[in-house]
Amino acid sequence: MRNTEAIECDFETFDPRGYLREYYQTIDFENEQLLRFFADCYRDVHPRSTLLEFGSGPTLYSLITAAASVDTIHVCDRLESNLREIQLWKRGDEVAFNWDPFIQRALELEGNSTVTRAELRRRAELLRRKLTTFCLCDAFRRPSLQGNHLNAYDIVQVNFVPESITSSLVAWERALQNIVSLLKPQGTLLLTALKHAMYYQVQEQIFPAVSIDETRVIQTLRKCGVREADVLMRTIPASPPYRGYEGIMLIEARFRH
């Protein structure tokens, strides 16, 4: 089993912009399915909900539809460099990554078949306003959040985090349980996870991963207090298949306690 220090060392050379170029330069099959997943999840969300994006990386795709549905969005990550990448976009910096294609496609999936430039700008500005808090986090600690944050959230989103920061099943389960502990009673967990991952790749760099599947996820969520009947899950194949994992699991879990 690898310890936390070793895991953190793996990410000292993580390049946020390289990661964005590797996975978000275009809207490929995987990104299309991710945008569809979030469009579906946010159709019936309470408008005064608070959302935590846990382990955001340098990305925004999962927050585009959320911005129109929730009251406030908090973002946390282990790396300050990832948070800075998002803050560049929030400030409208000319060197920020261009998320406009993702915003346009998200709006289309929400039902707007002819998205205008004005509508795209309005959604971007709405997301900028809803992004109110940035803080550091460590999934291996409880409490996991550092700095300015709430004690609990109505919605917690976590995209490709616990299985992508360790090669240990024990550490993966502990990290997921720590993240779930940030939910309010009767909160909602939106989880996307790599299936049967051996690694994931950013350009020439290889990062750790742990092999999990649908059964393992369900078992761990049950330990966290969610009923299997309250978990909606589907799996899509990896595309392209060479990235080190078999597929992507898209999971919505509603807690009732």
Explain the meaning of each model-derived region:
Residues 167, 197-216, 241:
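Acceptor-substrate binding/catalytic loop of class I
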Residues 149-150, 170-185:
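A short glycine-rich, Lys/Arg-flanked "PGG" loop and its adjoining helix->strand segment in the class I
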Residues 117-123, 208-225:
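Short alpha-helix
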Residues 91-145:
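S-adenosyl-L-methionine
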Residues 1-48, 61:
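Class I SAM-dependent methyltransferase Rossmann-like catalytic core
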Residues 46-59, 72-77:
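Conserved class I S-adenosyl-L-methionine
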Residues 142-156:
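A short acidic, Gly/Pro-enriched loop at the edge of an enzyme's catalytic core
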Residues 191-193:
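Acidic carboxylate diad motif detector
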